[in-house]
Swiss-Prot record:
<dbReference type="InterPro" id="IPR005618">
    <property type="entry name" value="OMPW"/>
</dbReference>
<keyword id="KW-0614">Plasmid</keyword>
<dbReference type="GO" id="GO:0055085">
    <property type="term" value="P:transmembrane transport"/>
</dbReference>
<dbReference type="GO" id="GO:0019867">
    <property type="term" value="C:outer membrane"/>
</dbReference>
<dbReference type="InterPro" id="IPR011250">
    <property type="entry name" value="OMP/PagP_b-brl"/>
</dbReference>
<keyword id="KW-0058">Aromatic hydrocarbons catabolism</keyword>
<protein>
    <recommendedName>
        <fullName>Dibenzothiophene metabolism operon protein DoxH</fullName>
    </recommendedName>
</protein>
<comment type="function">
    <text>May be involved in the conversion of 2-hydroxy-4-(2'-oxo-3,5-cyclohexadienyl)-buta-2,4-dienoate to cis-O-hydroxybenzylidenepyruvate. DoxH and doxJ encode different enzymes that may have interchangeable functions.</text>
</comment>
<dbReference type="Pfam" id="PF03922">
    <property type="entry name" value="OmpW"/>
</dbReference>
<comment type="pathway">
    <text>Aromatic compound metabolism; naphthalene degradation.</text>
</comment>
<dbReference type="GO" id="GO:0009056">
    <property type="term" value="P:catabolic process"/>
</dbReference>
Length: 211
């Protein structure tokens, strides 16, 4: 009776309770994510395809936050967001060394995951879902009036949580995004457009807590 009263008056005490931690469907993770692009592009100048022209994007690291909700023992929903990093977009193929511009972006990935059988303290999972990448800023380099579009894409997810002690765990996750976007600008007097394939691989390591 006393414990119940304390929980009603001080909800934070309930969060610290082992019984509550075991029953809560909510998880939270904070960690670092590496974004490794597998980039290519179809480049057009004044509407004409540039033979062999392509593009590349620099890899990034970002602080990320991951929120999870357990639907039941087998299924959960996860969403990851982060501090927006900036990638440098450069020419490739027959356009080597051309600094096209910089893009500050933020992918938000939502996946439905299935929990595989646990291996001791290791709890693996697989899943799939959707990503929305928002472009916060496009900065000029050799391309003037450089601009890139927001984009949606499918996402795949595989990972594992490794229990440390009651309620705390280490989380390792890999997410693959099949992401394309359109970019445009001016290279001198010529109008430049590109259909850019980014297809990043997001590799995360984080500390997690069940609340």
């Amino acid at each position: 009776m006393i414990k119940r009263t304390i929980c009603l008056v001080y909800p934070l005490f309930c969060l610290a309770s082992p019984t509550w931690a075991e029953e809560s469907p909510w998880t939270y993770r904070i960690g670092m994510t590496n974004v490794a692009f597998d980039a290519s592009a179809k480049v057009y100048l004044n509407g004409q395809r540039v033979p062999g022209g392509s593009a590349d994007a620099s890899d990034n690291n970002a602080l990320t936050f991951d929120f999870g909700y357990a639907i039941n023992d087998q299924w959960n929903v996860r969403a990851i967001v982060g501090i927006p990093p900036t990638t440098k977009v450069t020419g490739a193929g027959t356009l080597p060394g051309i600094q096209l511009g910089k893009i500050t972006y933020a992918p938000t990935v939502l996946t439905l995951n299935y929990n595989l059988p646990a291996l001791g303290p290791v709890r693996p999972h697989i899943g799939a879902g959707v990503n929305y990448t928002r472009i916060f800023e496009s900065r000029d380099a050799n391309l003037k009036s450089f601009d890139a579009d927001h984009a949606w894409s499918p996402a795949l997810h595989v990972g594992a949580d490794i229990d440390v002690n009651r309620g705390w765990f280490v989380s390792i996750d890999i997410r693959k995004l099949y992401l394309k976007t359109d970019a445009s600008g001016y290279l001198g007097p010529q109008e430049a457009k590109a259909r850019v394939t980014l297809d990043p691989l997001l590799t995360s390591i984080a500390i997690g807590r069940q609340f």
